[in-house]
Amino acid sequence: FGQMMVKDHSAANAELGQVAAEMKIVPPTEIDKKHGELVERLSKLHGAEFDRAYIMAMVEGHQAVGAQLGEWITASRPLGPPPDGDRKAADLARGGPNEEKLTQWVMRTLPTVEKHLEGALALQKNE
């Protein structure tokens, strides 16, 4: 499972990097605080305790990412920046010439995220 995660995530991130470059968006180069804390917590665990925590993180993470990607596809809010002016990368793409590129990446990536979630749930069920 872990090897599949590395392979699939590396491929998706490389492809997203190409899309971001075409959109002239510079992606973050460092891990965010939430994921940094997860890595730190997991690095202190071993054996079955690590396995349980890792699988739980994979379930929660893939549920969240799947929901975000699904929201992108079925966005019901008007396109453009949010009213508070906080323009995230996804909002910069909305309504612009690059929206289709990002939407295509999302549509190619969502099935993989769903496959990872199914795998993590199966592992969680079998512990």
Language-model features: where?
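His/Met- and acidic-residue-enriched segments that coordinate or traffic transition-metal cofactors
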Residues: F1-E127
